[in-house]
Structure formats: C-alpha cells, structure tokens
C-alpha cells in the first residue's frame, strides 16, 4: 500500500500493522512509504497516495501483490499494468473501501482498510515466498558493532533518526529529536532497520506542476550496492544484490554470509548513495 510522508500528511495511520515498510525517495527531496500487509491488517490505513515507477521494483519480489494506491501519471500506470503487480487503484472504488476522515483535506484525506480490500479481492494474490531470512540471534561470524542510533538525512523534510531501545529490543523512529508518532500516538518502531543504498536518477516524466521529475532507481536488473542492517542494538555492514524483478533482494556480509533479520517487523530505507548516513556508538 502506498502511504504518504509529506509533512502535511503526518501523522499517518496504520503503519504499525505492516510487516515491512519501505521508505523510498520521490521528487523534491520527500519520501513515501510502501507498506506490506500480510500477517496483520489495519482497520484504517493512510493517507494513501499515488504510485511511482520505483514501486514496481520494490514489489516485484513479492510475486503478484495487490498494490493499493491512488492513481499516478500515465506512464507509471502503464508500467504497473504490464508488471506482475495486481493493480488496485482506490479512485476506481466507492466508500466501501475508501474513507475520508473528518479533519483531513485533499490530497491528504484518502484512507482505506485492509479488511475491506481483502474482502473484495481475496483471490487476487497469493502469499509470496519470504524475502528475508530470520534468526533470533545475530548471525554467527558476522562482524558487528554496537550502535545507539542511525541518522538518515533524506532532506530537510525527512531527517530520519532511528534510536535503539534496549527495553523493547527495537529501534524507535524520530525526525531529528521529535518522535515519529502515528495518529493513535504510538511511535513508529522496528525490530530491524535496513539501509539499502541505491543509485537514483531522474526519469523523463514530470510528476507534478512544479516540474518535479520521476525519481528512478535500478533495484533488480543485476543491481547491487552497500547495505547496513541494524538489529538487536548492533550494526552489520554488508551488501545487497538482486538479479531479476521476481528475485528477492539478497543481503550478505562483506564476506558473503547471509544476513538474517530478527523475527518481527522490518523497515527498509532506500537511501540514495549521495546521502551521508551516520551512526552513534
């Protein structure tokens, strides 16, 4: 599901029910989320926004997922329709799946329910193969460094900080020093935070009236890059690679050993290679 992250869209709703959340760069230095719901649902999720071409690269590794969004520019929609993704454009549906909560205004007022969507399209997609490997302990032999926080300055709009909380064994999400909380007051957190460095470039398509070009990234055609995996209060330096659209992304240590995740929810930060990520130890 495509969820907005523009400052006016905050606080969001329903993200804590997602199994995996991808944060992707889009035009103008802002980011958006692709939230994966499989094990759990949410009665309200949003606000839901438009698709981007990068979403196909993110979601192709999940087989034939149901991709919920609110429209997009025509070249992107054409690419989605010719991809393995099952398109679910909320603009084509009535209030049976679309919610417009009081106090929200366009374009930040389109919400939905995973329950309602699954009820309508229960046979549209099938459970994908796992995209991560899991273990309750840090992989034996992996070179690790204790970490207190990781800072990801996407832009002045999104200066993301994750801080490790030993009590809950999770990383808590902040914007600078301000907790990133949802509409119910719960702070976003994750058992695993993956920083996946990607080469981004600007495509030929205008995304908005101010001239913002579509942000593109190669996530699957013999793609590879640096990765940082944070779990259990440690940092694991490694690499990521992916050969085809249908293949899950592989995360390995610098020596080639598979990096496993802590059982629980995972946030994947798709970070442009020019962004300087820092950690405190």
What are these regions (language model features)?
Residues 3-22, 27-281:
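A surface/extracellular/periplasmic glyco- and lipid-processing/surface-interacting theme
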């Amino acid at each position: 599901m495509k969820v907005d992250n523009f400052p006016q869209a905050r606080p969001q709703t329903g993200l804590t029910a997602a199994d995996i959340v991808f944060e992707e760069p889009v035009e103008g230095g802002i980011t958006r989320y692709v939230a994966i719901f499989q094990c759990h649902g949410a009665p309200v999720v949003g606000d839901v926004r438009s698709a981007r071409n990068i979403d196909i690269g993110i979601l192709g590794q999940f087989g034939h997922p149901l991709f919920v969004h609110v429209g997009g520019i025509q070249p992107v929609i054409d690419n989605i329709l010719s991809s393995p993704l099952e398109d679910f454009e909320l603009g084509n549906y009535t209030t049976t799946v679309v919610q417009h909560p009081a106090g929200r205004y366009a374009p930040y007022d389109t919400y939905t329910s995973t329950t309602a969507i699954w009820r309508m399209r229960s046979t549209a997609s099938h459970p994908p193969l796992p995209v991560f490997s899991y273990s309750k302990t840090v992989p034996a032999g992996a070179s690790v460094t204790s970490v207190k926080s990781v800072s990801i300055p996407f832009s002045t709009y999104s200066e993301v900080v994750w801080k490790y909380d030993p009590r809950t064994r999770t990383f808590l999400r902040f914007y600078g020093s301000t907790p990133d909380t949802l509409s119910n007051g719960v702070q976003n957190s994750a058992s695993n935070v993956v920083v996946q460095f990607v080469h981004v470039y600007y495509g030929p398509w205008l995304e908005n009236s101010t001239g913002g070009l579509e942000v593109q990234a190669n996530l699957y055609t013999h793609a590879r890059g640096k990765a940082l995996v944070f779990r259990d209060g440690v940092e694991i330096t490694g690499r990521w690679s992916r050969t085809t659209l249908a293949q899950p992304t592989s995360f390995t240590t610098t020596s080639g050993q598979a990096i496993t995740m802590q059982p629980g929810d995972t946030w994947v930060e798709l970070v442009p290679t020019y962004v300087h990520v820092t950690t405190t130890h």
